[in-house]
């Protein structure tokens, strides 16, 4: 890496961290953010079924809500992984590691059975990061001596107002760079030697975007970001490092 390339990485990071940090601060303090009307319209049907009034919670209720939500998501994800042909031990390890945001990659990405399994893990990459952010928000408010807030409100807004918009921008950029974005798990191609080869595919752009934003370690492919479908060019590396992997985790 040349000094100029390193400068570009740091420049993009420095330009992004201040506005993103201010946006996150508004979410923490329950202030109106950019696109407030749009986000509120998106969040309303999410809160309504669970009858969430976004009332302030006690420390006990906040922690219980955190545990219940994550337990429910673990059970759902473990069930999906198991029903799609993954071994019980692999389903347990993968679900636990993704929901705790540690993302041990004991699975072989190319042979991760089923599109539903991949979508379930993408969901956990959003919710595990959002759960951690919600707990951090509560700690910050507690240190400031103000009310802790509502866990359901914090986790939803972490996704709708930060993780999801940032992931969409990153995913579009990665698709432009050449990363595959498809629900097909594989394709068969004819090689120059006349034989046939099975090439694994998947929603790589979506996966990579939230993988880096949420500091998740599990890759869509076995070799993770060294695989050409996860990091196809210098520009995709800029997006992965400067925009997603440095900005939000640093804040």
Show where each model-derived region lies.
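N-terminal alpha-helical transmembrane segments of multi-pass membrane transport
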Residues: 1-93, 144-145, 149, 153, ...
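Generic structural hydrophobic/aromatic packing signal, biased to beta-strands
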Residues: 13, 80, 119-125, 139-140, ...
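Membrane-interface helix-loop-helix modules in multi-pass membrane proteins
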Residues: 16, 62-142
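Juxtamembrane interface at the ends
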Residues: 26-33, 135-141, 218-225
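P-loop potassium selectivity filter motif centered on the GYG triad
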Residues: 85-121, 184-241
